[in-house]
From Swiss-Prot:
Its EC number is 2.5.1.72. [4Fe-4S] cluster binds at C113, C200, C297. This is Quinolinate synthase. Changing T262V: 12-fold decrease in specific activity in the presence of NadB. Gene3D superfamilies: NadA-like. GO terms for cellular component: cytosol. The gene is nadA. Changing C297A: Loss of activity. Strong decrease in iron content. Forms oligomers. Changing C291A: Retains 5% of wild-type activity. One of its GO terms (molecular function) is metal ion binding. Changing E228A: 20-fold decrease in specific activity in the presence of NadB. Pathway: Cofactor biosynthesis; NAD(+) biosynthesis; quinolinate from iminoaspartate: step 1/1. Iminosuccinate binds at H47, S68, Y139, A140, N141, S156, H226, P227, E228, T243. Activity is greater under oxic conditions and is regulated by the formation of a reversible disulfide-bond between Cys-291 and Cys-294.
Length: 347
């Protein structure tokens, strides 16, 4: 088996930054997208980490802004025949797995995810084969092929509850791909978890020294942290949770100032939820010339207005998501297990 992904040494195929549009160009593409959505019987679903103007457009056109699973779930229930998925590639794949009868379009199929890239299916299969006694649980941020190998798919919003459940059944776990989220879940549940060593390029950049300095500057601020962050950052948090859970925490915490350690794309919906509170970005390591993500996923940034318009207008191999049917059927099994489990929690 080849060496597993190491976020400290990996070379990411970062995309070029999109060319900024003028005000007139933005207005032109916004109107064009609205028209094309109607003509195509399409609905737009956008992730919390996309740029604010993309989230705003999804709102204005009756679409959805949420985490990756809710995006796919919304799309499956919506009567539209076409889903425009503004996010990264695995999100489009998940939408296709749950809605095979629908046309799934993305602004670009080149929008990757460091967690997905960091868990190649060949290496992961070998890893699982080496530990056949373990139940395989994979994060939503994985390819359809990796999901197809799993017993369960999970999102950060129900990860603790699911592992608690599996641990109560005496099951030992393989967790992939995010090592930080895996360790957080392990600490919360005490489960027997063997972690794959992947990491999110955005959350892995948050460092304690810079966050401590910001905390000293704003001692009245609460710290909100996504569990994909390193353990030392999680330990500093007043609230830890998924994107939707962090937005909920922003509303319930009494603090008027919040330091947020996740992708800054979340600020659009979080600020809507708490319009009277001040939101501060948690600092990332290597700011300036050596900054890598700077608290914003470079692949999420590929979801621009021009690319969305082109996807709706052109379709084709550059924009339409396809998943092999046999692979889709296998990946659907652990996804449905998760959906059924999540339904019991809501009940």
């Amino acid at each position: 088996m080849s060496v597993m992904f190491d976020p400290d040494t990996a070379i990411y195929p970062f995309p070029p930054k999109p060319t900024p549009l003028s005000i007139d160009e933005k207005a032109y593409y916004r109107e064009k997208i609205k028209r094309l959505l109607k003509e195509r019987n399409a609905v737009m679903v956008a992730h919390y980490y996309t740029d604010p103007e993309i989230q705003q457009l999804a709102e204005e056109t009756g679409g959805c802004i949420s985490d990756s699973l809710e995006m796919a779930r919304f799309g499956a229930k919506h009567p539209a025949s076409t889903l425009l998925v503004a996010g990264v590639r695995f999100m489009g794949e998940t939408a296709k797995i749950l809605s095979p009868e629908k046309t799934i379009l993305m602004p670009t199929l080149q929008a990757e995810c460091s967690l997905d890239l960091g868990c190649p299916v060949e290496e992961f299969n070998a890893f699982c084969d080496a530990h056949p006694d373990r139940t395989v649980v994979v994060y939503a941020n994985t390819s359809a092929a990796v999901k197809a190998r799993a017993d369960w798919v999970v999102t950060s919003s129900i990860a603790v509850e699911l592992i608690d459940h599996l641990d109560s059944l005496g099951e030992k776990i393989i967790w992939a791909p995010d090592k930080h989220l895996g360790r957080y879940v392990q600490k919360q549940t005490g489960g027997d978890i063997l972690c794959w060593q992947g990491a999110c390029i955005v959350h892995d950049e948050f460092k304690t020294q810079a966050l401590t300095r910001l905390q000293e500057e704003y001692p009245d601020a609460a710290i909100l942290v996504h569990p994909e962050s390193p353990q030392a950052i999680v330990d500093m948090a007043d609230a830890v949770g998924s994107t939707s859970q962090l937005i909920a925490a922003a509303k319930t915490l009494p603090h008027q100032r919040l330091i947020v350690a996740t992708d800054r794309g979340i600020f659009y919906k979080m600020q809507q939820a708490v319009p009277d509170k001040e939101l501060l970005e948690a600092p990332t390591a290597g700011e300036g010339a050596t900054c890598r993500s700077c608290a914003h996923c470079p692949w999420m940034a590929m979801n621009g207005l021009q690319a969305i318009a082109e996807a709706l207008e052109q379709e084709g191999s550059n924009h339409e998501v396809h998943v092999d049917e046999r692979l889709r059927e296998r990946a659907l099994v652990p996804l449905n297990r998760m959906l059924d489990f999540a339904a019991t929690l809501r009940g």
